[in-house]
């Protein structure tokens, strides 16, 4: 069976239950006991909502834990010592939740930068990690930026490789890239808005790449902030057990510090930039709240950790060390996320997050990374983060720098040395590592060697994003990143006739960003670019102007439609062509039917009995099917969710060849497709709009005008969020309409949800337009 690409497949996540629930199944009536257990403070707790019974899709499986244990046994004391001081982490969140502001404080407190600059600061310097001019102007992160810094905790220096990622859905590939190579992440959630649409997307990406996370609730100094409501949403909407490790001292504009509920200590950030931390006793008016939240934390840990569950049953209060160890185990096993709180802009609570990164996020030796051994039929092999092992690294990001192409590499195994030769597994080419650097946003620091588990960059290596490199001693390949389909296209042409830089820019952008696609449409004689949204394409058009001095004219944004069928149909097609000499002959018989299911990939199958069509011709039929799926007969867009089965046919002893059967299959495909009640599918988007409460009527009216289906509305203290499903074709220009309806105070995010049939009148119009183009 040949599986042809339709909509990208998501990697399935591991499924397991919480630790205490597992203990319950072993201990007979233990679960009943826990249902009415006592809290450490003596209060009886009704346990109907016992979280251990919940299924955490991303939790570590027993098989994964066993493989990881085998890998750890292969590490030397020196390997474990080196790994214990290293953390590879990403900063992820919904747009405007304060990721870059948070990262700026991290760099300042770790001594990496000398002064703090704001994302939209008056000094016009911009945040360190927003190195592109466009990022500083728009106040958003477009590319993920890498840096490294050191943090001293308990008289030990820890080395952080840190990646700040975009929050805008149009740049989601940057988040995918970062999470693919990171061992842990800090998820930032707004204390006012709570879990938002892109928070859910980032959570899904973290699960896809098995990334444990700690959570920081930011913007605690804003009016309407409610960290405990945000924690409830993390539990309910993200379906992962979460509990606070802190409670705030004061609220909103009176926020003065936080209380560490594990150690029962109050911390106040002092100094001009919050760099001085004063330690004090817990304020009297917060003592009850601290005990309540501490009991809740232990209760949550009992759901996901066996050791705490045992203590919980015995009505013993765990020690500080036992609580911290349990948080670490549960976080690394992806069953739990510890929650801290503060305000990045107000310089409160950031240092505690740095401590939590050390305490609770895994080092490279505590994460299972696997490759595929191409010399053993792609057998899965665990990668060992030891410098004694053969080198294996993944090129996860490309950038065009002033010294040529800059390739970011995560070293999974072995070490990478300047001057060494490494092999690109995809192309088989050997390349020399002439320069090796550590990145600090757009600045770089030269190094001679990079060890296992580290992230670096190198120059002069010709490769694509997602390529695997080894030292040539092993033929391992890393599984590639998930790349979503493009949903928006527009035609583009340079204003001047000189198109050298025009082509050069496209080649570079496509190498850098797999979600940015360029093709030439032979019918309209136009160059068409496709991407994840209007902003995504707008940024690339602007970058062409700035970086390549090419001004462009663009057409109207076009929707990437799909074509599909609704009922099965049979086909029997004979392709004959004779014009003297060798002719062409191929006959194919079979059925075409719709494919059900979430992914709706196109499938090509054969069931030929008695060799009526030889295998080499069947392979040509497969190619014909793949080619036919690239351009449907209704409106010329890709085909989705079609299964073609060839179960009979005929050949001619002289005239049959691969081309004949490829042509016959394409013609049979077209005939059967048109008989199968075909439909044009359009992208349906998840829309999330946030705006001040006084504009609620305007926003709902605007969405109704677009025939959006409203799914949910949440009213906050001073703003509301409405979630809806809407056809992408109606969303062009929505940003302008929303600005006008909310006096510029509304914001929205769009994310692809699924494909659905267009209304009949729209399908008619699209088909008529396509037929008109064909005649020209």
From Swiss-Prot:
Its main location: mitochondrion. Residues 84-365 form the tr-type G domain. InterPro entries: EFG_II, EFG_III, EFG_III/V, EFG_IV, EFG_V, EFG_V-like, EFTu-like_2, G_TR_CS. One of its GO terms (molecular function) is translation elongation factor activity. Pathway: Protein biosynthesis; polypeptide chain elongation. The keyword Nucleotide-binding applies. Belongs to the TRAFAC class translation factor GTPase superfamily. Classic translation factor GTPase family. EF-G/EF-2 subfamily. HAMAP family: EF_G_EF_2_B. This is Elongation factor G, mitochondrial. It comes from Vanderwaltozyma polyspora (strain ATCC 22028 / DSM 70294 / BCRC 21397 / CBS 2163 / NBRC 10782 / NRRL Y-8283 / UCD 57-17). The lineage of its organism: Eukaryota, Fungi, Dikarya, Ascomycota, Saccharomycotina.
